[in-house]
Amino acid sequence: MRKYLVIGNPIGHSLSPLIHNHWMKKYHLSDSVYEKRKIEEKDLKNIIEEIRKDEVVGVNVTVPFKKLIIPFLDQLDFSAEETQSVNTLFKVDNKIVGYNTDRAGFGDTIREAYPRSNDPIILRPLEGIRIFIIGAGGVTSSIISALKSEGADNIILSNRTKEKANELKKLFPELEVLDWGKRPPICNIVINTTSIGLT
């Protein structure tokens, strides 16, 4: 049996098994199963060992482990390296590689709302648009990276714990950090990355 997992804590809310098992059944992948597993930080090393031993084929990673998993990996792809956030991992040439698909997924959504054009004036559709991000969780660096790739140059971030916001500012120096509870200037786009989005 080819086993795939989504790991996190909490994990009860995850619809990933429902979605993935539906498609596995539809495409007659009867030798595959996708499960969710609630883990603690101490379990991360064991997850990697399960992949090394081919007990698990691939793993999706959700809160709070997107950054915590990195030290256990052999390699990161470009987007995971840039964002310092991993949400997918599997074995490639006997190495456990971490990927970040959040960046591409959010980028696709942004491009639908703000399409690029052949017109050089709107080649970077988010240039000059003020964006306010609430929260500095595991997906935030992926969102900032996707926004920047579409020309965003005016991103404001606010988080309850300023240390986490400042960590992101180290990755993205042009980011403006606003103290929690302060009102931002009028923004064109507001993005919530707090844990309230899990409910």
Language-model-detected regions and their locations in the chain:
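Glycine-rich adenosine-cofactor-binding loop
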Residues: 8, 95-103, 110, 114, ...
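Short glycine-rich anion-binding loops that position phosphate/pyrophosphate groups of nucleotides
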Residues: 61-68, 137-139, 195-198
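Intrinsic disorder/low-complexity segments
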Residues: 115-130, 186
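NAD(P)-binding Rossmann-fold cofactor-contacting core
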Residues: 150-172
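Phosphate/diphosphate ligand-binding glycine-rich loop within oxidoreductases
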Residues: 2-114
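Residues at the starts of beta-strands that form the adenosine-phosphate
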Residues: 3, 33, 130, 153-155
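Rossmann-like adenosine-cofactor binding region
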Residues: 171-199
